């Protein structure tokens, strides 16, 4: 595919903002696209923007009334090419490495001016491996070579993924086990830490990248502070007004539990590694988070929402 070049930043006009949302899945491309997208849609509408969503079947509901919803999948973009018509800015979420070139070609055909990619921290690990093994990094490279102004967003774990079940480190089975028997079973329970960001804050970062030009051709580390597993359990217990039992699983038991829930070994490997690393090197990783510039707070212009905030908004999922 030809590479297109643009030598100057192209300002975003107020045309259609196209968002993409896929069904929750448990594979290497997992991300809570619907949770983030619905928050983003509301924020863009409040800014006076026109919003269209290309959503897989089970993600077509729950959008604001004024959002145009087109049923289709960003993983099979050629089947829904009309969704790209008139799109000037695209929030690319849930794309697949094998078909992202097709999506980018449709964006060019539509004269899209900007694409904001919901990426992950996967590229930081993938770059040490042969290109044929890349997933996230393959998508990032394709976007960079598309000729469209781009921004990559590499977020912390999204708090809402615990409810949607799209990332094991978020406690993807906690709502079920807390409701069923009031217990959380987790590996590295005593010292596990993981960085989190509220989906409302992440959506605000995306909105800033979609509608302004301050972040063109940059990678935004949309990271929140590392939280301990026990502190998250305490937040849920306090909101419920009752104790939550805990079972500290050995790593191999944690792996077996996540396998039972349908997670592939690759996702489990990353999760176990990260939980242990953040616990062992908490001070260094916290400092790395604090050193990121621009910070999420710099971008959105307000303090970040906390895990307690998220729990208070979603406590019914645990009742």
Pin down the residues of each PLM region.
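Conserved NAD(P)H cofactor-binding loop of Rossmann-fold oxidoreductase domains
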Residues: 94, 119-120
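SDR active-site lid
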Residues: 236-242, 248-251, 262-266
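N-terminal glycine-rich "phosphate-gripper" loop used for MgATP/nucleotide binding
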Residues: 92-107, 280
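Cofactor-binding loops of NAD(P)H-dependent oxidoreductases
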Residues: 72
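A hydrophobic C-terminal alpha-helical subdomain
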Residues: 3, 252-319
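Structural motif detector for alpha-helix initiation sites
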Residues: 199, 229, 251, 306-307
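N-terminal Rossmann-like NAD(P) cofactor-binding module of classical short-chain dehydrogenase/reductase
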Residues: 84, 88-92, 116
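Oxidoreductase cofactor-interface core, primarily capturing Rossmann-like NAD(P)-dependent enzymes
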Residues: 2-58, 62-64, 76-78, 85, ...
